[in-house]
Structure formats: structure tokens, C-alpha cells
Amino acid sequence: TASRRLVVHGPGGWTEVRELEPEPREFDIQRIDGLPPSQVTPDPESLARIRREASQVRKARQHLDDRIDFADGFVWPVHGPITGVYGSQRILNGQPRSPHWGVDLAAPTGTPVVAPAAGVVTLAHPGMYFSGGTLMLDHGLGLSSAFLHLDEILVEPGQRVAQWDLIARVGATGRVTGAHLVWRMNI
């Protein structure tokens, strides 16, 4: 595993630089069968849509300011069994695909989803190709949360939310085999 350089710039112009050495680890393998073939190997038109949607997600993550909305910590957006873990290798209909970049929380369609920390809504999309109803919150300093496969989104881009605010409802939209929430965090 290659080392990574972390550079932090603070108020007043100070800078802290650290070299990080990630430790190798093994990830779970998750086999998911029974998906529609178009959700495993999309056609060229769908691939173009997927690229456009990925661009929207990247743009939503570019928001950077000095807010520290995560200072009070995080709460779980949904309570339910963890059915998929971050980093697990996904084998879809027998074909290896990208790792899973979130935590799957099983819950029935319509279950309330709350803001795990305060933030500003940067993306609210009702139906992305893979992730279905997709919502993103910026928590400040480049830290964001994403919530995937939503049935209903109850907030709008630009809206400020507080920790515990109702923001969405669990669904089974996009590439899924059942109702659940995927919670992702990025920095």
C-alpha cells in the first residue's frame, strides 16, 4: 500500500503535513445475484447517463467552507441491521465489480431517514441509475454524507438541516434487491 500525504491548512496560514501509511486489510466478499443484466453491464446510453450523474455527485462534493457542522458527532440516519459493509468486494450476477463505498442499513420502504449531523443539502436527485433517490449533505471542511436508494427526499439543495432533522425516507430505488439505505461519507 502506498503512503499518502495529508496536508491541512488552518486559519492564519498555518500548515500541517503528515505522511500516512495505510495498513493492508482484507475485505468481505458479497455475492449479489438476480439483478437485471442492465444493472450489471449497462448499455452505452446508460453509461453516458451514469457518467453525467457521477459528474453531478463530484460537483456536489466540491463545496468547501469553514463550517464544522460535524462537531457534535454523528448519529445513525436509520436504525436497522447492517447488511453490507464499506469496502466489501461486490460480485454482481457472478461478475466482479467495484467495491462497496458505503454501509447498508436494512429498513422497510418509508422508514424515516434523519440527518446524522447538521449540514447543507448539496444534491437531491429523485432517481439516479445505480443509486436511485440520492441525497447529499455537506457537513463542512469538505466532509459530506450521501444517502442512496431513497423512496422520498424531503429537503432541497441549499437547505440547511440540523442533526436529527427528517430528510428522507428509505426506499428500494436504483440497483437494489430490497429496501435499504446506503450511507456514504467522503472527505
Predicted features and spans:
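Short, well-structured beta-strand-loop connectors
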Residues: 112-123, 154-170
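Short, charged beta-turn/beta-strand-edge "cap" motif at the junction between a beta-strand
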Residues: 12, 128, 167-175
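Cationic-aromatic interfacial patches
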Residues: 1-25
